[in-house]
Swiss-Prot record:
It comes from Methanocaldococcus jannaschii (strain ATCC 43067 / DSM 2661 / JAL-1 / JCM 10045 / NBRC 100440). GO terms for molecular function: iron ion binding; superoxide reductase activity. It holds the Pfam family Desulfoferrodox. Belongs to the desulfoferrodoxin family. It comes from the Archaea. This is Putative superoxide reductase. Its EC number is 1.15.1.2. Keywords: Electron transport, Iron, Metal-binding, Oxidoreductase, Transport. It catalyses: reduced [rubredoxin] + superoxide + 2 H(+) = oxidized [rubredoxin] + H2O2.
């Protein structure tokens, strides 16, 4: 049963929040239409037990769905994806990651990327 409703975001930087926030690691600047690596993981390792684990991670470019990776308690909630940057018609874009803990709900993190 999930005890948290809606989408949660890190506010105070507590260990609890860091265990549930899907941090995005990638370049701050990328070339338009080029592929670049995006790593998504928790800031602090999250328990992966039968009754408490990260269920999935989703990645979006703004509101555009890119990918979803599902996990079981036998996996590390971390993923690396190759993402294609948008065309140069924009100066920047937002990557948005969502992560769901089976007990503590959905957590979100955003990162702004500049286009070269």
């Amino acid at each position: 049963m999930t005890h948290y409703c809606g989408i949660n975001r890190m506010k105070e930087g507590t260990d609890f929040e860091k265990k549930h926030t899907p941090f995005i690691e990638c370049k701050d600047r990328v070339k338009a239409n080029d592929y670049f690596e995006v790593k998504i993981s928790t800031g602090i390792p999250h328990p992966m037990e039968d009754n408490h684990f990260i269920h999935w991670i989703e990645l979006y470019m703004g509101d555009l769905y890119l990918a979803r990776v599902d996990f079981t308690q036998f996996m590390k909630p971390e993923v690396k994806l190759m993402v294609k940057a948008p065309s140069k018609e924009h100066e920047k874009f937002i990557l948005r990651a969502l992560m769901r803990c089976n007990l503590h709900g959905v957590w979100e993190y955003e990162k702004e990327i500049l286009l070269e």
